[in-house]
Amino acid sequence: MRSIYCGQVTSSHVEQTVTLCGWVHRRRDLGGLIFIDMRDREGIVQVFFDPDKPEAFALASELRNEFCIRVTGVVRARPDSQINKDMATGEVEIFAHGLEIINRAEPLPLDFNQTNTEEQRLKYRYLDLRRPEMAASLKTRARITSFVRRYMDEHGFLDIETPMLTKATPEGARDYLVPSRVHKGKFYALPQSPQLFKQLLMMSGFDRYYQIVKCFRDEDLRADRQPEFTQIDVETSFLNAEQVRELMENLIRGLWQNIIGVDLGQFPIMTFDEAMRRYGSDKPDLRNPMEMVDIADLLKDVSFAVFAGPANDPKGRVAALRVPDGAQLSRKQIDEYTQFVSIYGAKGLAWMKVNQADSGLAGVQSPVAKFLNDEIVREILSRTSAQDGDIIFFGADSKKVVCDAIGALRLKLARDLDLVENCWKPLWVVDFPMFEEDGEGGVTAMHHPFTAPKDFTPAQLEADPLAAYANAYDMVINGYEVGGGSVRIHRGDMQQTVFRAIGISEAEQKEKFGFLLDALKFGTPPHAGLAFGLDRLTMLLTGTDNIRDVIAFPKTTAAACLMTDAPSFANQQQLSELAIQTTVKAAE
């Protein structure tokens, strides 16, 4: 039906006859002539209708926005005064001599020239996707997956599918359950990741596996989370952590170069402990110049219990955060930041404005200055590299509260004060704790229970699980965790030790992971892998801060599809076939 896409018409086609198919993006009737901007997935081109072609001109008078049409015409060069440098096709236009209205459009529920609510956009997603911005995002996503497939193929990876209907296993979030009609009373689970299957593929000898795969987690949603999401899933045999990181870093560096022409350079490596100490986060945004500085050793003997208590507590922390030029903040603004950190459990927010740094105690203004002497103040100013006109905020509480509260404050201040550098800052975060306390006297795996410990024997792990570090690694770009992985456990005794450490009994091990423990008995190779979030990578590469902008048909933050009205009630016959009774009834 067409000879060329709208967005591909250039000055090289001048005087050629072309046929275009697409939609009316905009229509302008200038009396003697009718102009339309005609759009398809590749872009927009200007078409004009002249009364000299009376049949086409008469039909063009009926055109309205979003009519689906076919146009035949001659490519003309625009006069110099009419060249539109903002359009890829801005040097040309189409003089139409043929027009076919393929389908008319009713008045639109969306206005493409205004900002529509997200609810409107999701309800009429098929119209929202016609917007050039949305088409560009999904085309970028397609380019990303195409690049990934080429890279993986060139490096010897096999694209192997794993099951969608599988067994529920404890991986952190809730599973989406699928009832079985054949095995009444039993349920499949949709996979949170292909974790165990990709490990089994390594045990089967496939050596290098990848898959671009849907995963499902029934968890509370945020702006960058969806109940169904897409992973670039990777697993390798006989490679150590450093080799996996090198392979995957080169993939991401190549991706950034290919998609947006940016050289990310070599990724720095930072330990989890250093990231938490300096930034209060295991996914630090290095574009933000502010860092947390520990000062507990200076405050153990002060008379101010808010500082002295955590300073003397092995599980406590006192940290300072210097804000460049922050002394300009008003008391009202400081109170707002104090309210903000309370969300993260902080009981208050002490502060110190630096008027004259070289004057020590005499050169600062602070409600807590009366509890500090000149030597302490000078050391705080020195450690934080404070300058005249700065403000220093203090966090004093448990290590977790200080990291959470001051880490979040660091991000908010950088946004509010425009301190974030406009660049790309990737890194690897490594050496995560193997376990963390669960608040009930036990421990839980920080990543997942199939991650191998770093330089720990089963006996050492059993004796002191909280002392173990995981052989795990996360890739972080501009404060987003874009991928994470680890070396996996490949010995049965270590796997059972980890299961016991997190409170999984022998009986439960056999019930839920018997197939894995059996497989580990038959010459399992050392293996390691990683998974990237495709949605999040696309979000970064397209410059949006909303993951729903890079998914064709996303869910709302309430995990609903406004367009299809999913989820919906099942009818009684369906429920009966599945031997299911529900306590919630559909509205009559």
From Swiss-Prot:
Protein name: Aspartate--tRNA ligase
Amino acids binding L-aspartate: 171, 217, 447, 488
Location of region: Aspartate: 195-198
CDD domains the record matches: AspRS_core, EcAspRS_like_N
Main location: cytoplasm
Top-tier EC class: ligase
Cellular component annotations (GO), alphabetically ordered: cytoplasm
BP GO terms, sorted: aspartyl-tRNA aminoacylation
Keywords tagged on the record: Aminoacyl-tRNA synthetase, ATP-binding, Cytoplasm, Ligase, Nucleotide-binding, Protein biosynthesis
EC numbers, comma separated: 6.1.1.12
Gene Ontology terms, MF aspect: aspartate-tRNA ligase activity; ATP binding; nucleic acid binding
Reactions that this protein is recorded to catalyse: tRNA(Asp) + L-aspartate + ATP = L-aspartyl-tRNA(Asp) + AMP + diphosphate
Pfam assignment, any one: tRNA_anti-codon
Subunit structure: Homodimer.
Cellular compartment(s): Cytoplasm
Protein family according to the UniProt entry: Belongs to the class-II aminoacyl-tRNA synthetase family. Type 1 subfamily.
Binding site for ATP: 217-219, 226, 481, 533-536
Cleavable signal peptide: none
General function of this protein: Catalyzes the attachment of L-aspartate to tRNA(Asp) in a two-step reaction: L-aspartate is first activated by ATP to form Asp-AMP and then transferred to the acceptor end of tRNA(Asp).
Keyword Protein transport: no
